[in-house]
């Protein structure tokens, strides 16, 4: 269906988001702020979140995925130190073969880059167990990151539930100047919207500036838009989209999707592309945006190019052209990780890879690698300049490292000079990169499912355990504040990636590293409280649960007996994950009450089950301090029922008898 001119009710025009969501609506009413359920056409998983997602899918007892397309990618845990990663990959490959899922082998590339190249379809819905799934918005797809359990449910044919979003139009005008690229655009978006206060919103790009951006550039913008906390971001599907799909041999997947001229939005933000200059996110948040020139001159130890944000053919060709005939500064360790095998093969064929290697850049495999902190950790107190999307403290694998997020152009300039450098100051002409009319297409590392699933044996190594089970929510909570944390606590703070990520399939072991970065004694304290018969309660500040979609930031707290998290505000994916695992997400009615609670305080919530069912305000008593305060929730009726049952798996079993 061509969605270029589909009118809404009473002749009102519709935007892209509304058109696609209405077409996929299966539950609820399309009304901003209300819960809706949408049909999911495609799913993707990556190996760090995928093992648990497929274990949960198996527990549902369904014999075949019920989506149009589901793909299992291996791109996170590709450094085999010990048996765990290899065992997980064998499990994932066998599950994919048995249940009708495509399997993208290690080395084929980063899930978002490969999916954009080979599977993304305008006008469809994509749910991925990775927070940067909105990359698909660059091709005109409603692409949303979620926890693995939500993805498992979607694979089983259930709707995906979300709050019907406020839609913010980002009206792009003008065109980018030389040495300014899509990464600078999304850093400008982060400067405008910040990393908090955007839950329940979607960014819809439009305006005359859109046609000046290629699909990979658009995908860079929608990818890192995840850092604002929006549900997703999306671009129109136009002739530029058609050219990209034709070059991928997929022109038949194209359809035009544009907003109606009279579409209405909750807000319109104008961005003049011609006024953007090279930008950088300084430590320790993607929202700490400054101009490169304002912080230029910092000595740099490391430059890393790649990640799902900036590892496309266009990005790496820019790097190659800037580096051609030059050398990486002797004080800089430089590494490049292509986003896909297709990109690497293109660079090898046209000679660009030789230019990169000749300059002194190390070439890593086509994977996430340094971005998630499981390789290329910087030196102690080192400065690392990266083209990735997150610079949270400790995420690089080095707790005291300073990580700066930049465009490929700025990264290449910095490699050469050894200092953080505005690329305009290199004094050379801006390289021109022409997108190929035809990409190299070789899908031999994407394995189809078995023709006869009954003959497939699921491989389960010792690292693969059963999904942990939770009890129904008790009538009352008698607990202890196990930890009190501040604002902008990320899922990296809650449960680290990096070297610990190989334990993702082993929840009891992985739980030992809860809050390791913040408080190494948390696990010991939590287990002591649990074993005493009390429950654990976490208290946090603003935007609790930023960052990665990893549901282990909810599964592991559930395992150690956390029953409630009380904060000033939550980020969307983490709040949904808490619900999925039977943990109650509560917020302070009066934020000042945060200051009246301390770690170790004994907390009680009487008649919690009844309170959840009957209203959104709940009374909490701090027995240690002898005071009471109110908290609230914004859960739907369905979410309340999930929590009462002890989580989504238990709820589904009750619902389906």
What positions do the PLM features span?
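Fe-S-dependent hydro-lyases/dehydratases of central metabolism
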Residues: 3-4, 8-657
């Amino acid at each position: 269906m061509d969605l270029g001119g589909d009118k809404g009710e009473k002749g009102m025009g519709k935007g892209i988001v509304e058109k696609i969501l209405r077409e996929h609506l299966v539950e609820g009413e399309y009304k901003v702020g209300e819960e809706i359920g949408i049909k999911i056409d495609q799913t993707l998983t990556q190996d760090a979140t995928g093992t648990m997602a497929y274990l949960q899918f198996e527990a549902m007892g369904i014999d075949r995925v019920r989506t149009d397309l589901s793909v299992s990618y291996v791109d996170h845990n590709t450094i085999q130190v010990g048996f765990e990663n290899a065992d997980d990959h064998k499990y994932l490959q066998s599950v994919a073969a048995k249940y009708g899922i495509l399997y993208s082998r290690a080395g084929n590339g980063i899930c978002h880059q490969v999916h954009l190249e080979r599977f993304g379809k305008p006008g469809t819905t994509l749910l991925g167990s990775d927070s940067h799934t909105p990359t698909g918005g660059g091709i005109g797809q409603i692409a949303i990151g979620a926890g693995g359990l939500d993805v498992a449910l979607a694979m089983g044919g259930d709707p995906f539930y979300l709050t019907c979003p406020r839609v913010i139009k980002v009206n792009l005008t003008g065109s980018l100047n030389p040495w300014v690229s899509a990464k600078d655009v999304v850093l400008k978006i982060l400067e405008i919207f910040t990393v908090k206060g955007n839950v329940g919103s979607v960014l819809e790009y439009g305006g005359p500036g859109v046609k000046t951006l290629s699909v990979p550039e658009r995908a860079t913008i929608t990818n890192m838009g995840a850092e604002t906390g929006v549900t997703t971001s999306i671009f129109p599907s136009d002739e530029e989209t058609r050219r990209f799909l034709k070059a991928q041999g997929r022109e038949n997947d194209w359809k035009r999707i544009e907003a109606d001229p009279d579409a209405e939005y909750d807000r319109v933000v104008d961005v003049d592309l011609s006024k953007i200059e090279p930008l950088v996110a300084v430590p320790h948040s993607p929202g700490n945006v400054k101009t490169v020139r304002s912080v230029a001159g910092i000595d740099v130890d490391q430059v890393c190019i790649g990640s799902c944000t900036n590892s496309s053919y266009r990005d790496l060709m820019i790097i190659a052209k800037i580096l051609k005939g030059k050398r990486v500064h002797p004080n800089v360790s430089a590494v490049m990780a292509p986003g896909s095998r297709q990109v690497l093969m293109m660079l090898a064929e046209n000679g660009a890879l030789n230019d990169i290697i000749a300059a002194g850049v190390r070439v890593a495999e086509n994977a996430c690698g340094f971005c998630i902190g499981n390789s290329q950790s910087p030196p102690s107190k080192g400065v690392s300049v990266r083209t990735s999307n997150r610079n949270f403290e400790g995420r690089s694998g080095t707790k005291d490292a300073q990580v700066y997020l930049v465009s490929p152009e700025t990264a290449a300039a910095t490699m050469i000079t050894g200092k953080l450098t505005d690329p305009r100051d290199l004094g050379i002409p801006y390289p021109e990169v022409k997108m190929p009319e035809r990409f190299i297409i070789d899908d031999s590392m994407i394995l189809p499912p078995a023709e006869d699933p009954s003959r497939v044996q699921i491989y389960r190594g010792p690292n693969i355990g059963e999904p942990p089970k939770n009890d129904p929510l008790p009538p009352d909570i008698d607990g202890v504040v196990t930890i009190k944390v501040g604002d902008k606590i990320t899922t990296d703070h809650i449960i680290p990636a990096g070297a610990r990520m190989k334990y993702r399939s082993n929840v009891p072991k992985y739980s030992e590293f809860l809050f390791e970065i913040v408080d190494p004694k948390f696990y010991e304290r939590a287990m002591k409280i649990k074993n005493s018969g009390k429950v654990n309660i976490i208290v946090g500040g603003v935007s609790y649960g930023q960052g990665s979609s990893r549901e282990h930031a909810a599964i592991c707290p559930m395992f150690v007996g956390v029953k409630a998290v009380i904060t000033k505000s939550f980020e969307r994916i983490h709040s949904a994950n808490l619900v999925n695992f039977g943990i109650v997400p509560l917020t302070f009615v009066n934020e000042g009450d945060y200051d009246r609670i301390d770690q170790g305080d004994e907390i009680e919530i009487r008649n919690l089950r009844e309170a959840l069912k009957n209203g959104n305000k709940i009374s909490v008593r701090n027995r240690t301090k002898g005071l009471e305060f109110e908290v609230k929730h914004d859960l739907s009726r369905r979410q309340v029922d999930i929590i009462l049952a002890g989580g989504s798996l238990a709820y589904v079993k009750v619902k389906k008898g």
